[in-house]
């Protein structure tokens, strides 16, 4: 075997190594793009695409609770101080929400000041505890560009144990319950009772008050 044969083998090995690196880079880029597609660029939480991805994988497996959170008076803050301050406030609130996320508790920002919390494998009393915890976490002063900002939240809750309940129906129920919480004075949560077609089962103020 002469030296040219060795050189040829080395060249082939180098080409294979380069191709493998290129494949790995492409796959990493694809994975990064998938992550970015599911991530809200303002808050870093999952976005609407992430929520759709969750629903596509869930397919009615196990008990599920949907908590629809809307920040109280956020529009006033946004209009008064500007969108950049509003975005900073959303990031701060999202940081608080991320403290209680895990594989069974997922947080999504679906637009504006609206968030969805999904709780898997849930029990009703634990869902209400989570709602109170969320209200307690976000209800505090936030300091953005020398402004002291204070927000509270209104939460609508719906739960299902059935694989036949569609996501659109669940979101509509949680949304309706959230608006019921708004009508009750905000800074509280309400639970949708599907069997009676009623919005309110129980309302409690945040953990710092009545829980």
Q: Across the structure, where does each feature detected by a protein language model lie?
A:
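Alpha-helical scaffold within the catalytic cores of cyclic-nucleotide enzymes
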Residues: 94-98, 126-147, 173-175
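Residue-level recognition of strand-loop junctions within catalytic nucleotide-signaling folds
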Residues: 79, 118-122, 160-161
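Hydrophobic framework residues that shape the active-site pocket
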Residues: 74, 93, 107, 115, ...
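Conserved helix-loop-beta segment at the catalytic/binding core of cyclic-nucleotide signaling proteins
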Residues: 38, 94-125, 142
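Signal-transducing coiled-coil linker helices
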Residues: 2-41, 49-62
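Cyclic nucleotide signaling catalytic output domains
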Residues: 107, 133, 147-148, 154-162, ...
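Conserved nucleotide-binding and Mg2+-coordinating catalytic segments in signaling enzymes
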Residues: 34-53, 69-83, 91
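Active-site-flanking beta-strand signature of metal-NTP-handling nucleotidyl enzymes
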Residues: 65-70, 107
């Amino acid at each position: 075997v002469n030296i040219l044969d060795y050189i040829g083998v080395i060249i082939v090995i180098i080409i294979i190594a380069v191709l493998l690196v290129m494949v790995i880079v492409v796959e990493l880029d694809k994975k990064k793009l998938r992550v970015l597609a599911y991530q809200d660029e303002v808050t870093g939480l999952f976005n609407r695409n992430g929520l759709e991805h969750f629903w596509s994988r869930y397919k009615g497996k196990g008990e599920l609770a949907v908590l629809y959170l809307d920040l109280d008076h956020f529009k006033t803050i946004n209009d008064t101080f500007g969108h950049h301050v509003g975005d900073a406030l959303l990031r701060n609130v999202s940081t608080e929400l991320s403290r209680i996320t895990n594989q069974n508790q997922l947080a999504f920002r679906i637009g504006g000041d609206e968030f969805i919390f999904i709780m898997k494998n849930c029990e009703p009393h634990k869902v209400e505890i989570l709602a109170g915890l969320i209200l307690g976490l976000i209800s505090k002063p936030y300091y953005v560009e020398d402004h002291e900002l204070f927000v509270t939240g209104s939460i609508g809750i719906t739960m299902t144990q059935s694989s036949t309940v569609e996501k659109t129906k669940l979101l509509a129920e949680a949304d309706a319950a959230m608006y019921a919480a708004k009508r009750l004075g905000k800074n509280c949560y309400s639970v949708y009772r599907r069997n009676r077609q009623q919005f309110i089962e129980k309302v409690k103020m945040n953990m710092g008050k009545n829980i």
